[in-house]
Amino acid sequence: MKITILTVGKLKEKYWKQAIAEYEKRLSAYSKIEIIEVPDEKAPENMSDKEVEQVKEKEGQRLLAKVKQQSTVITLEIKGNMLTSEGLAKEIESRMTRGQSDFTFIIGGSNGLHKDVLDRSDYALSFSKMTFPHQMMRVILIEQVYRAFKIMRGEAYHK
């Protein structure tokens, strides 16, 4: 079992790094875990729609270059499927019983994900209709993946 979290941009704040490190340690009991950061595209503040698409395309190319062909890709999208923690556990477990053992979760940059990345996605996941900083989403995602494994194993977890 392998979980990859593929994300645009680097974590800078120590507190986010510490939270990620804690959940990486916990999750390692259930799965190999890798976090891959691709550089975000430098862009001016007030971009035209065309410039936004160009930024998303460049970031998307960087993301797709890191996705293994056999990996099940789960993109985080505002318009994705909203699940409970138990629902996420069932989704992962269902895919595992069908022989899928390599999962890549993709978190886009501040402008979202390019169409090419969305087209490569096997499942669109949403945690909320709200927008969150991608640094925070990394922590929320890794915690929920950890929680999903606890649920799948029938182990106690904090509700």
UniProtKB/Swiss-Prot annotation:
Q: Which gene encodes it?
A: rlmH
**Which region is the signal sequence?**
none
Q: What is the native source organism of this protein?
A: Staphylococcus saprophyticus subsp. saprophyticus (strain ATCC 15305 / DSM 20229 / NCIMB 8711 / NCTC 7292 / S-41)
Descriptive protein name: Ribosomal RNA large subunit methyltransferase H
InterPro entries per UniProt: Alpha/beta_knot_MTases, RlmH-like, tRNA_m1G_MTases_N
Q: Which NCBIfam families match?
A: PRK00103.1-3, tRNA_RlmH_YbeA
| Gene Ontology CC terms, in alphabetical order | cytoplasm
Function of the protein: Specifically methylates the pseudouridine at position 1915 (m3Psi1915) in 23S rRNA.
Q: What is its EC number?
A: 2.1.1.177
Q: Does the keyword Methyltransferase apply?
A: yes
Residues given in the record as S-adenosyl-L-methionine binding sites? L76, G108, F127, S128, K129, M130, T131, F132
